[in-house]
Amino acid sequence: MKFGKRLLPLLLTLSMTASLLPAAALAAEADAGEKHITILGTSDMHGNIWGFSYEDNSETANNGMARLYTYIQQTRSENPNTILIDAGDDIQGTIMTDDLYNKTPEDPHPVITAMNYMGYDAMTLGNHEFNWGIPTMQTILGQAEFPVLATNVTDAAGELVTGAGWTIVEKDGVKVAIIGVVTPDVPIWDGGKEGIDGATFEAANVAVGKAIDEIGDQADVIVVSAHMGMYAEFDEEGGSDSAQKILDDNPEIDVLQVAHNHVVVNETQGTTVIGGVRNGGRDIARFDLTLDADNNIVDATVEVVDMTDVAPSQEIRDIPLVAEAHQKTIDYINGGGSGEDGEGGVALGSTTAKFQPENEISGIPAGRVMDTAVMDLINKIQLENSGADVSAAALFKDTSDLPAGDINYGNIFDIYKFDNTLYRVTVTGAELKAYMEWSAECYNQWKEGDINISFDPEYPDYLYDMFAGVDYEIDLSQPKGQRIKNVMFKGEPLQDDQTLTLAVNNYRYSSALKSEG
């Protein structure tokens, strides 16, 4: 549904009555019967219910589902015609989820329990929902009291893995269709896990088009909740994993929610409002629609609201399972990851100094611009355990650190939170340099007059790999693809046809290396 056909009846009505009514009456006539629908969109909450960093054992100041709920309730009090949707990556990402509750999927899950309490109208699958295989995902999400959507994923029997690809929510007589679609790149990262190799992940743009056809005239408003970024991640030619391609092929979409990349998106293309948020519950996307008496959209706006100044909801924290899970996680960390009673306070080791230096320039993380002890540690471990010539690894966030003092499980999770598998693969010098160029794309090109290094917001922290076993330079004055200079291996220039072995985790191998051939 688009503005063009909605505005025409309204404009004709106004033009016919303009000569007959005074200005005040005209305004009242125009406002009569108007409806206001608010759609709130969250995504990539990654298990952060409380607003608490288990790695640092401290409250956070700007994130968490509890903060989101405060804003959600405030919005509902202002406009009861509010719809709440989510674009996935919610049941993964903290010690609470990954090390405790996702390993017992048949037990009540704190994230889904909190989402039920918050009153979600729909959720779209994210790629991280698949991390434990499809049966585990289905068991956990089966606890949801709201539809879970993925219009482009079917199992080996041809059935939608969540049972639904879209749903319709009615508010004030306005029927809002919500279509959920996840990046089709899931098999790149989670292939081999139960149920995934037999599943079909259809191109997002194609699947959304089919869903819109199915919906037909059942809805007044079309919302697409897409767990992917605006631009293609792997399929640059076909755009099967691109929200932009979804919109290009389906311009009748009224609201487009994007996710996955953990970056703020706030824009309008034509008459489609587009919004996306960062990770961990740091923001919420707000879409406000004004419709006339015939349910035609006459105005639409999007805003991404930062949660920094929002207080966490005690209601969410007081949900019995949430409170229990929070304390259970703290006990698990203090017990060295054992989770057993009586084993609290067990240290896994100790350090005499912090491994991450202070930022030399405000706003520019040291972990992104210099060699650090924490990165050296990760690469050293990978080299020693693989016997490879070169190691590549990333910090999952630029500030990941091992602080001075005792080391507990939370500290380890902070610097390496995923259960990846370490691979040793054979590469040529040319292939390694191409990989290094890909990593260096996270920087913006330096231009004359720039006073600081800056980063491309489309590249999250975890996509910047650093390399050990080779010496190299990055020339930021050069465009992407031409930045890696003077690569030295064992004191000699690395030749393109030279063969060496590389230690890299399975995630990066599948996404940045194998997928490139």
Where are these regions (language model features)?
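Bacterial N-terminal signal peptides that target proteins for export
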Residues: 1-11
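Intrinsically disordered, low-complexity repeat and linker tracts
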Residues: 2-3, 24-32
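C-terminal segment of classical bacterial N-terminal signal peptides
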Residues: 8, 17-26
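Acidic, metal/ion-coordinating pockets
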Residues: 28-311, 369, 374-381, 441
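Feature captures C-terminal
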Residues: 36-38, 48, 56-63, 67, ...
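Acidic/histidine-rich, surface-exposed loop or edge segments in extracytoplasmic proteins
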Residues: 41-56, 348-365, 416-418, 515-517
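N-terminal accessory/precursor segments of enzymes
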Residues: 180-186, 190-191, 302-304, 342, ...
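A short C-terminal boundary segment appended to hydrolase-like catalytic domains
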Residues: 291-407
